[in-house]
C-alpha cells in the first residue's frame, strides 16, 4: 500500500518537474526573443537607409515622384519578406486625395503605406508602429535627403517587421497584430496620420497603442558623447501601464538612458504635438514617441546617411522592438488607464 506521505512526495516531485519545464520553456522563449531583436543590426539599417535616403528619391516630398518611388521601395521590401499589405484585399496603399491636403505644394494624391503581421491569438487587437516616410523634397539641384528625418524611423520599421516575421515563421506570435504604418504628409502638417485616424483601416477602439519613431539616428548636441540614450515623449500621458512596461522592458533587455526632458508639458518645443503619434493620442490611443532630439542638419540638405550613428540606431530600434513584443504578447491588453482613473476620480467626487 502506498503511504499518504509517498503520494504527497510524488505530487511535489511532479509539480517540481512541471515548474522546471515551464521555466526552461520561458528561458528558451526569452533567448529566441533576444535573437530576433539582435537580428536588427547596424549594417542592415545602414544598407536600407543608404537606399531609402538616396538622391534618387529626390527628398520624398509629399505627392511627388520621389515620394511615390519611396512608397514602391517600402512595398517591395514587405513583399520580399512575405509580409502582407494592410488594406482589405492585401493592398499596401491607403490613398489620400489631393483635396485633403490644404497645401499649395500638393498637386496630386498621396498615400500611406501599410503592412501587417496578423496576431496568432488576438488578431483583432492592433499595435501600430508608425514613421513618416516623406521629407521636404528638393530646391533646384539641392536634394534634402532626410536620412534622420525620418529615414531613420522608416527603415527601423522595416527591420522590426523582418524580426517579427522571423518570429511568426517560427511559431512565436505575435499574439496581437502588428501594423506597420508609413505615413505621408507629416512635414506639411501631419496629414497622413490624421487621415489614417479619421479613416482607420483597423478600429481605433481595438488599437492597443501607437509606437511612433521619428528621428532616431543621430545624437542631440546637448547629449554630445552620449551613445546610450533616447528621448521618450508621451509614454505616461494616457497609460501608466504602457509607461511602466516600457521602463521594465528597457531595464531587462537594453539598459538605455530614457530621457523624459521633452515630456514636460512646460517644455517650449511642444514635441508631443509635432509628430504623428499625436493624431492617435487625440483619440485616446496610448502612445510612445521615440526621438533623438534636433541637430544642426535638421531640415537641411546635410541630413545624409553618412552622419547616422548606426550602432546607436540599432540599439534604439531593438528597444522599440522589445517594447512592441511585450505589448503584443502579454496576456492582458494595455489600456488608457489614466483616462479610466480620471473618470473614476470624477465619479467619486460627485
Regions found by a protein language model. Give the residues of each.
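N-terminal capping segment at the start of a domain
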Residues: 28-35, 39-69, 81, 85-87, ...
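Bacterial Sec-dependent N-terminal signal peptides
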Residues: 1-28
